[in-house]
């Protein structure tokens, strides 16, 4: 799967909006993930005690983790598909240490699309959403291949 230059432009254009508030976007995305798929919360010992959206919004640790997640994803997106070096340690930790199933990466991808659209409706129309979906699918496909190399059937 390959994205065109125009698609990468759309992806990176919206990502510039994310970078204006990485932690805030990340927190919103994680809250959306945990509310929509409560089972994902079980993978995070640090956040298991957060039961309500208000508790999640008040959590500095959740905000910090959102920043970490989106900083890593931004680094991958900026490589425009040439992300082998960035993907390898991420796949290693998510497969062997955290044991994060690929399905959960699909869930967070959906949360990313939803939050970007809700925060930036004018800049994140159908074409930009399609491009971001494609970029996130490429990321998931490549991380799934790394999982397989590591013997993780996530």
UniProtKB/Swiss-Prot annotation:
CDD domains xrefs: Mb
Globin domain ranges (all copies): 2-148
Sequence positions that bind nitrite: 65
InterPro entries cross-referenced by the UniProt entry: Globin, Globin-like_sf, Myoglobin
Residues reported in the UniProt entry to bind O2: 65
One of the record's GO molecular function terms: nitrite reductase activity
List of residues that carry Phosphoserine: 4
Annotated residues for binding of heme b: 94
Keywords, comma-separated and alphabetical: Cytoplasm, Heme, Iron, Metal-binding, Muscle protein, Oxidoreductase, Oxygen transport, Phosphoprotein, Transport
Cellular component per GO, a single term: extracellular exosome
Family from the record: Belongs to the globin family.
Subunit structure of this chain's protein: Monomeric.
Name of the protein in its database record: Myoglobin
Gene expressing this chain: MB
């Amino acid at each position: 799967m390959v994205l065109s230059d125009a698609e990468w432009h759309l992806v990176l254009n919206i990502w510039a909006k994310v970078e204006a508030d990485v932690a805030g976007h990340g927190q919103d995305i994680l809250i959306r993930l945990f509310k929509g798929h409560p089972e994902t919360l079980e993978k995070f010992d640090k956040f298991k005690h957060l039961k309500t959206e208000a508790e999640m919004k008040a959590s500095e640790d959740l905000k910090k983790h959102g920043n970490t997640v989106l900083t890593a994803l931004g680094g991958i997106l900026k490589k425009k598909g040439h992300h082998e070096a960035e993907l390898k340690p991420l796949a290693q930790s998510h497969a062997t240490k955290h044991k994060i199933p690929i399905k959960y990466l699909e869930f967070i991808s959906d949360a990313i699309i939803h939050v970007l659209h809700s925060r930036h409706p004018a800049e994140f129309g159908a074409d930009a959403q399609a491009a971001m979906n494609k970029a996130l699918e490429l990321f998931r496909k490549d991380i799934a291949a790394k999982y397989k190399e590591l013997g993780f059937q996530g």
